[in-house]
């Protein structure tokens, strides 16, 4: 569901449901759900897991001078330098409410800061960021948040008037404005809006204090409250009036970011690059959490081979790579032999004998799947859906596409989290069992042409794939081959990303292949609840409607006791496994290469945090 590590965007910045990304796009983007959440990694299971009731936690105002996160930074490190990375595609919008793509998440994560974040080494702990402190009452339904004073929005030049607008202080009213915009039914924020449907009210007590009252008890109410960001009223309604239609479609403002975070967007050349510079009045400087790197450049390069060559030539300092590149191209003398995994630091892998790059590897907090639109026949039949999964050779996909850099899964939770039921094994590749199910569903080759038919209709359908995505292309090619052997004709339509997303938003497709990033604490509501099935642009785009699932989801949301919630999640996992609305594919390893010139690098449970990086200096 990368916006990276500032509250689940550090794991996921705007809690938008599912930044959907595939293969190399995932490895390059900061984790965020599409229309929704920046994202649990492999080592969380190895950690002494503390599933805590974060909704009932309280923080007292911080009296120390530094943030608890300051221990991960090097405040005395030499400031300066340029950090160059690459992303696979540009975005249509940088609007923090309506933007829904991985690229937007990545840029926004650097330019703004939510009220709270997670501790980098102990992500079960919530820490203040733009907030100074908070208190909860009434079983987590009432949350009072105190903002830091002196936080400043970046200056900007108004795209309409051409007038320069200086820095302006952030207030609680800007956070209220963010929520008001999300909840405006005319704003294109359907997926994000669903997360706040149970928020009864939010008000600014004064310029620096907020009060939120949730209508229902919700185990993520504190987390969701701390995910909020201030939205600059003076930028989005310079005349004092809010126009939701203009907010959606104002391409000039939606190509800008006015945040209050560590970096300021200074240049965007469409389909070429983004340039960001350190914001010298960033409030994090006084807390010891200001980045040392002066400038960030994100090159937009569609071809993965071109990106890799740029890394080798020194044009890039860090790069997410495909499993194919990892296995075939990172074993040369330029690359350190030891791989950095969760808990390791760059200092643990000293470079020697001409080595220029370090390798970083950990499970991504995301999964890929093949989804079946249950509004379309024959995918309204769970016998057919189960047969489809039995005809998907996931072991072959893991081996040939991912080079065994990942894990096959059976359900919708992160596979190393306590919510995932490890007793439920993925269905095997079993064409014989699939044939029996299809026969039971009355599919047979009645005219001997090699294609199954039922009620005079052939078993022919179209699966969508994204142009220029080699991982997805390989997966669907393998699937097509196995389906053909079973008498099923799968056509493949290759679409550009905006067209692809448009098809999903309108539910105008039969089968798709996508991926979800996952928040730290999972809530299946947005992707799986029946109420989300008909939302245009919503995350339940496959139209999964199941009353038993709805009851479980609603119970999960209201259960604060961790062990009880885990049991409910495992029941939900079992139900999804029985229904097979998706063919769950793989949780991939997140594979990254970083230049030897980058220091203060650590692989945290939720991945790398490039804000901590130092160019030169000590490790």
For each of these PLM feature ranges, what is it?
Residues 187-241, 264-267:
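Surface-exposed binding/hinge segments that line
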Residues 23, 27, 36, 67, ...:
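Detector for C-terminal structural segments
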Residues 171-176, 207, 211-213, 261-262, ...:
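Alpha-helical secondary-structure segments
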Residues 249-254, 281-344, 480, 489-491, ...:
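Ligand-site clamp/hinge motif
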Residues 48-51, 85, 270-271, 289, ...:
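Ligand/substrate-recognition segments at binding pockets and active sites
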Residues 113, 119-121, 207, 226-291, ...:
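Gly/Pro-rich hinge or "lid" segments in bacterial periplasmic/extracellular proteins
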Residues 132-187, 307-310, 378:
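Aromatic- and charge-enriched surface segment that lines or borders ligand/interaction sites
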Residues 68-71, 81-138, 180, 258-260, ...:
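N-terminal lobe/hinge region of extracytoplasmic solute-binding protein
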């Amino acid at each position: 569901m990368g916006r990276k590590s500032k509250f689940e965007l550090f794991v996921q910045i705007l809690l938008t449901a599912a930044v959907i990304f595939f293969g190399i796009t995932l490895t390059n983007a900061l984790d965020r759900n599409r229309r929704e959440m920046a994202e649990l990694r492999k080592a969380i299971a190895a950690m002494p897991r503390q599933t805590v009731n974060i909704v009932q936690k309280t923080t007292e105002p911080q009296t120390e001078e530094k943030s608890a996160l300051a221990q991960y930074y090097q405040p005395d490190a030499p400031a300066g330098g340029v950090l160059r990375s690459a992303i696979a595609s540009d975005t249509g919008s940088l609007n923090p409410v309506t933007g829904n793509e991985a690229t937007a998440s990545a840029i926004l994560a650097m330019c703004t800061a939510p009220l709270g974040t997670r501790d980098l080494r102990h992500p079960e702990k919530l820490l203040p960021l733009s907030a100074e402190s908070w208190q909860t009452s009434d079983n987590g339904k009432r949350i009072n948040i105190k903002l830091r004073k002196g936080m400043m929005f970046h200056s900007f030049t108004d795209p309409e008037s051409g007038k320069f607008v200086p820095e302006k202080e952030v207030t609680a009213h800007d956070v209220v404005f963010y929520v008001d915009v999300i909840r405006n039914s005319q704003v294109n924020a359907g997926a994000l809006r669903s997360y706040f449907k149970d928020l009864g009210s939010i008000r600014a007590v004064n310029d620096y204090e907020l009060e939120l009252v949730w209508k229902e008890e919700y185990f993520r109410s504190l987390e969701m409250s701390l995910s909020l960001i201030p939205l600059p009223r003076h930028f989005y309604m310079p005349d004092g009036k809010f126009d939701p239609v203009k907010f959606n479609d104002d391409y000039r403002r939606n190509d800008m970011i006015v945040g209050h975070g560590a970096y300021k967007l200074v240049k965007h050349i469409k389909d070429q690059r983004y340039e960001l510079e350190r914001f010298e009045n960033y409030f994090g400087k006084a807390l010891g959490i200001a980045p040392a790197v002066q400038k960030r450049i994100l090159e937009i390069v569609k071809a993965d081979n071109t990106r890799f060559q740029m890394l080798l030539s020194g044009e890039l300092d860090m790069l997410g790579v495909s499993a194919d590149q990892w296995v075939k191209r990172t074993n040369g003398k330029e690359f350190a032999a030891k791989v950095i995994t969760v808990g390791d630091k760059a200092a643990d892998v000293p470079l020697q004998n001409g080595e220029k790059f370090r390798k970083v590897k950990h499970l991504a907090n995301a999964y890929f799947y093949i989804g079946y639109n249950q509004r379309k026949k024959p995918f309204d039949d769970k016998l057919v859906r189960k047969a489809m999964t039995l005809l998907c050779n996931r072991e072959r996909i893991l081996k040939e596409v991912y080079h065994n850099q990942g894990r096959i899964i059976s359900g919708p939770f992160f596979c190393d989290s306590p919510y995932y039921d490890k007793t439920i094994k993925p269905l095997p590749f079993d064409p014989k069992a699939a044939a029996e199910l299809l026969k039971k569903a009355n599919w047979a080759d009645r005219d001997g042409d090699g294609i199954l038919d039922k009620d005079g209709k052939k078993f022919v359908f179209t699966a969508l794939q994204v142009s220029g995505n080699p991982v997805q292309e390989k997966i669907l090619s393998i699937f097509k081959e196995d389906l053909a052997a079973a008498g099923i004709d799968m056509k493949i339509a290759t679409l550009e990303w905006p067209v692809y997303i448009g098809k999903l938003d309108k539910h105008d497709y039969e089968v798709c292949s996508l991926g979800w990033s996952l928040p730290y604490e999972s809530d299946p509501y947005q992707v799986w609840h029946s109420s989300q099935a008909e939302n245009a642009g919503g995350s339940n785009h496959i139209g999964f409607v199941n009353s038993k699932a709805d009851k479980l989801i609603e119970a999960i949301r209201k259960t604060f006791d961790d062990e009880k919630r885990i049991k409910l999640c495992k029941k939900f996992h079992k139900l999804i496994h029985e229904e097979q609305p998706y063919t769950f594919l793989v949780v991939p390893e997140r594979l990254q290469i970083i230049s030897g010139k980058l220091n203060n690098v650590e692989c945290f449970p939720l991945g790398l945090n490039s804000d901590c990086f130092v160019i030169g200096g000590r490790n």
